[in-house]
């Protein structure tokens, strides 16, 4: 599935560049305000929530018919940042959703399978504060991170293995995501965060992605050392999204038994 998605994304970028040349995106960005800081929102010392608007997924099919406005009203009160899934073919998302979410003043993560710097420009021109760069999918991670920073964004660099994390660190990532979902099988294992969290120096921001069904899962991941949790399917499919997120916020705010991660010096002493 992942190979099919990447192939589709490469074709998509070619078509997008024909319709909207990069020069137009650059011109649009020059007259835009600076985006709301993503690192400040998700790295403030408490366990933060990145709540996602996601209509569908390859593993679950259609997830929710709820509109963007309905969910953003909930997220505005309870989320520290918002992730907008923009892929249309597999997740039923769009850039219009990202642009629409800018009205609420939250830092926005454009979540897609980026394979070219063009999409970084597109994200910024649509109001994003951050983009998802997947280790092993984006072709030049260091260049992608630098391009984001040139455009006043800080990317979330997604990892699945210890090697991914070392590559992300070498590329200069400051926000590292551990995806608990296997992108090939779609199986979820929260223990992936448990195993990989010690590899992320304490000075950086660690985001645990996928698998939070309720407050118990959130408390477990907070205990593993996550600085932020990316939550999408649970609130989108919940009968009462606000009540669910209130329970999750309460659970992580009361989590006192958080595993300490290594500082930079300790990290290099441990793993050099």
UniProtKB/Swiss-Prot annotation:
The record's top EC class is: lyase
- Identify the keywords attached in UniProt to this record, alphabetized: Amino-acid biosynthesis, Aromatic amino acid biosynthesis, Decarboxylase, Lyase, Tryptophan biosynthesis
- Alphabetized Pfam families for the sequence: IGPS
Q: In which pathway does it act?
A: Amino-acid biosynthesis; L-tryptophan biosynthesis; L-tryptophan from chorismate: step 4/5
Q: What is its EC number?
A: 4.1.1.48
Q: What InterPro entries does the record tag this protein with?
A: Aldolase_TIM, Indole-3-glycerol_P_synth, Indole-3-glycerol_P_synth_dom, Indole-3-GlycerolPSynthase_CS, RibuloseP-bd_barrel
Catalytically driven reaction(s): 1-(2-carboxyphenylamino)-1-deoxy-D-ribulose 5-phosphate + H(+) = (1S,2R)-1-C-(indol-3-yl)glycerol 3-phosphate + CO2 + H2O
**One function term, GO molecular function aspect:** indole-3-glycerol-phosphate synthase activity
Q: What biological processes does GO assign it?
A: L-tryptophan biosynthetic process
User: Gene3D superfamilies per the record?
Assistant: Aldolase class I
What PANTHER family does the entry give? INDOLE-3-GLYCEROL-PHOSPHATE SYNTHASE, TRYPTOPHAN BIOSYNTHESIS PROTEIN
Indicate the family of this protein: Belongs to the TrpC family.
Q: What is this protein called?
A: Indole-3-glycerol phosphate synthase
Q: Tell me what organism the protein belongs to.
A: Methanothermobacter thermautotrophicus (strain ATCC 29096 / DSM 1053 / JCM 10044 / NBRC 100330 / Delta H)
